[in-house]
Amino acid sequence: MTEFTLSDLERIVAERAGMTDGSSYTASLVAKGQTRAAKKLGEEAVETVIAAVEGNRADVVTESADLLYHLLVVLKIADVPLNEVLAELQRRTAQTGLEEKAGRPKA
């Protein structure tokens, strides 16, 4: 089995977002707009948290998959490539968490 990456999923989301034959959940979600997609992302985040708190490993896996998928849909609608998010993670992990937090702008 070849390794499946988030970049693979990002490509699939982009392909399916443009489908017009009514067969794609992704296209349907994108057509409903960012508010709906973000709401779904939030729902999946909560479901992932619940699975983790309950210690249900299988549900953590499936809900995490849903969470990552919906995050990539939200990023697609926002026109934010996954590489930008990965670059930010790389920037943050180049220093300790406390150093990164101290460098954030004050609210």
UniProtKB/Swiss-Prot annotation:
UniProt key word NAD: no
One term under GO cellular component: cytoplasm
GO molecular function list: ATP binding; phosphoribosyl-ATP diphosphatase activity
Pathway(s): Amino-acid biosynthesis; L-histidine biosynthesis; L-histidine from 5-phospho-alpha-D-ribose 1-diphosphate: step 2/9
The Gene Ontology biological process terms listed for this entry are: L-histidine biosynthetic process
Which InterPro entries did the record assign?
HisE, PRib-ATP_PPHydrolase-like
Per UniProt, subcellular location reads as: Cytoplasm
Q: What is its EC number?
A: 3.6.1.31
Q: Which UniProt keywords apply?
A: Amino-acid biosynthesis, ATP-binding, Cytoplasm, Histidine biosynthesis, Hydrolase, Nucleotide-binding
* Catalyzed chemical reaction(s): 1-(5-phospho-beta-D-ribosyl)-ATP + H2O = 1-(5-phospho-beta-D-ribosyl)-5'-AMP + diphosphate + H(+)
Against SUPFAM superfamilies, the record matches this protein to: all-alpha NTP pyrophosphatases
Report the superkingdom from the record: Bacteria
EC top class named in words: hydrolase
Family to which this protein belongs:
Belongs to the PRA-PH family.
Stated name of the protein: Phosphoribosyl-ATP pyrophosphatase
Q: Which organism is it from?
A: Brucella anthropi (strain ATCC 49188 / DSM 6882 / CCUG 24695 / JCM 21032 / LMG 3331 / NBRC 15819 / NCTC 12168 / Alc 37)
